[in-house]
Amino acid sequence: MTTPSPTPPLAAAEVAAAAGLQQRDLLAVLDRVGLEPAVAFLVHDLTARCDTPDNPDAARIGLAVEHSGHRTERVLAVRKGEPVRVDEETAGPPPVRLTFDLADLVRGVYGPPPGPGAGLFRVERDDAWFVKNADDAEPFRIFESYMRAVDVLVRAATSRPGDLGRLAARHASDKWGLWHWFTPLYEHHFARLRHQPVRVLELGIGGYQNPDEGGGSLKMWRSYFPQGRIFGVDYFPKHGLDEDRIHTLQGSQDDAGFLRRVAEEHGPFDIVIDDGSHVAGHQQTAFRTLFPAVRNGGFYVIEDLWTAYCPGYGGAATARAEGRTSIGLLKSLLDDLHYEEWTAPEPAAPGFAAPSLVGVHVYRNLAVLEKGRNSEGTIPFFAPREIDYV
């Protein structure tokens, strides 16, 4: 027996069809239908399209929706092997809340997939709750369960296929869900390489001193690139994670000699990802040493740009990141990208990366650098260098 939608059929159909309208027309439809009826219909359809959850610990996630100064919320119960449903039994606020604008949620559920960098919701997380409810033996288990639960809801709420996000959740990689939201961006840049025999090097494996712990991202990349070879570097030995297409290496990302040996033995690489110590000086050393080891057409990625604002990582407690940090490096790379356009009478020498840097893509806490031949030549000399009519 089919459970009827809690919204009148005509209104429900109108909301679904409105996803393809211009913004002002969509808002007019939502004003006419009303927040509560629209959300009732959306939640009905959203929970019905959710994949079967596989999070080991039961999760309660708030879904808040706002429209025209009004707000409503449902708490969704996400339990392993069960359909996602509205939780009307458990008291207390959920430890994770996703807040959508009503129009964005309508487009997410019924429209085409959004762009990779589209921020469609706000995330609120009660970190104290996770600390209080953590298992001493497995302190991150419940957090990882929530990462998987969030992945199920976000994919249903944004029409994203989310293959890499699903792999991140399966392997407990922090690149998607609660920690970061990187996987749509990675898919955007890496999709053309997916079925090639790529060589991927990631700095930072995770799991701290335990030789058998961590490696979630390495396993995610192994699954995403079926012909790829995945190399991981960590300060601690991680040989317990080695398998057919995953090879771990022990060393410091601040040791240029070690990194050169890695590049000589295992490079050149299609992709290098710096998810290591996040210390400013270490990031600079890794970039200087490993960017040359990326082939033309490949990518160099720096994660966790937030540490540029943290003194404990070599950053500064300021609103403007300094030159020695990852953000400072990216600012200088924008100048280097345009080195052929410099007009100073005696310009300084461009950075070493300038002739082979063809793209700088910066997102929240993530930078993707494209390697290639940056020698297009300057704008023609007869193009005006000044404007005399303003």
UniProtKB/Swiss-Prot annotation:
Pathway it works in: Antibiotic biosynthesis
Catalysis: reaction(s): 8-demethyl-8-(2-O-methyl-alpha-L-rhamnosyl)-tetracenomycin C + S-adenosyl-L-methionine = 8-demethyl-8-(2,3-di-O-methyl-alpha-L-rhamnosyl)-tetracenomycin C + S-adenosyl-L-homocysteine + H(+)
Cofactor: Mg(2+)
A Pfam family: MycE_N
InterPro entries referenced in this protein's UniProt entry, alphabetically: MycE_N, SAM-dependent_MTases_sf
Record keywords, A-Z: Antibiotic biosynthesis, Magnesium, Metal-binding, Methyltransferase, S-adenosyl-L-methionine, Transferase
Gene Ontology MF: a single term: methyltransferase activity
Positions annotated to bind S-adenosyl-L-methionine: E202, L203, G204, I205, G206, G207, Y208, S217, D234, S252, Q253, D275
Binding-site list for Mg(2+): D275, E303, D304
Keyword Protease among record annotations: no
GO BP terms in the entry: antibiotic biosynthetic process; methylation
Top-level taxonomic group: Bacteria
The enzyme's E.C. designation: 2.1.1.306
Active site positions, chain numbering: H278 (proton acceptor)
Functional summary from the UniProt entry: O-methyltransferase involved in the biosynthesis of the permethylated L-rhamnose moiety of elloramycin, an antitumor polyketide. Mediates the methylation of the hydroxy groups at the 3'-position after the sugar moiety has been attached to the aglycon.
Family: Belongs to the methyltransferase OleY/MycE family.
The name this protein goes by in its record: 8-demethyl-8-(2-methoxy-alpha-L-rhamnosyl)-tetracenomycin-C 3'-O-methyltransferase
